[in-house]
Amino acid sequence: MTLSAVATRYANALADVVSPGSSPIRPEAALEELRAFEAALKSSVELHNALTSPSVPVGRKRAVVGRISDTLKISPIVRNFLFVLVDHRRIASLTEILHSFELIMDERLGFARAEISSARELTEPQRTALSAQLAQLTGKQIRMRFAVDEALIGGAVARIGSTVYDGSVRGQLQTLERRLSTER
């Protein structure tokens, strides 16, 4: 099984446990707790090595995860999930599991993630209007991340999954160029 398949399997299991209505913890809270743990793991090479090394006994790893969970005030559900990762030697895959978990929860809760590139910084009213248009196109609530790409000349490009909505001047010029070259 590939690493991404493994990450998806663990992420699905966590999503099942923290789904709205079936858990005392909200999915967003679980995600934040896991991010906090991931940040602690990334901040210390020694900690990362201790939790990922096969030579460190699982009992010690669990004790370390327990202490960090106490310090970060991590809920029992997320703590138990971290214990499962330690027990199955998957703690090194936490970043990929987190990414999969975010995508799974977005899908289950009716959200879509959009990467928006524009020629200049968009104003708040422009962002709101763009969000409303994308929500109407996709039928989902939109979570947007913005970037400026001056090469677009003007307009914007939105990427949602594998779908690209190109409203840039550069894209229009490229389309015009293709049409003109095929008409020759």
From Swiss-Prot:
It is a peripheral membrane protein. Keywords: ATP synthesis, Cell inner membrane, Cell membrane, CF(1), Hydrogen ion transport, Ion transport, Membrane, Transport. One of its GO terms (cellular component) is plasma membrane. It is found in: Cell inner membrane. The keyword NAD does not apply. GO terms for molecular function: proton-transporting ATP synthase activity, rotational mechanism. Belongs to the ATPase delta chain family. F-type ATPases have 2 components, F(1) - the catalytic core - and F(0) - the membrane proton channel. F(1) has five subunits: alpha(3), beta(3), gamma(1), delta(1), epsilon(1). F(0) has three main subunits: a(1), b(2) and c(10-14). The alpha and beta chains form an alternating ring which encloses part of the gamma chain. F(1) is attached to F(0) by a central stalk formed by the gamma and epsilon chains, while a peripheral stalk is formed by the delta and b chains. F(1)F(0) ATP synthase produces ATP from ADP in the presence of a proton or sodium gradient. F-type ATPases consist of two structural domains, F(1) containing the extramembraneous catalytic core and F(0) containing the membrane proton channel, linked together by a central stalk and a peripheral stalk. During catalysis, ATP synthesis in the catalytic domain of F(1) is coupled via a rotary mechanism of the central stalk subunits to proton translocation. This is ATP synthase subunit delta. It comes from Solibacter usitatus (strain Ellin6076). The gene is atpH.
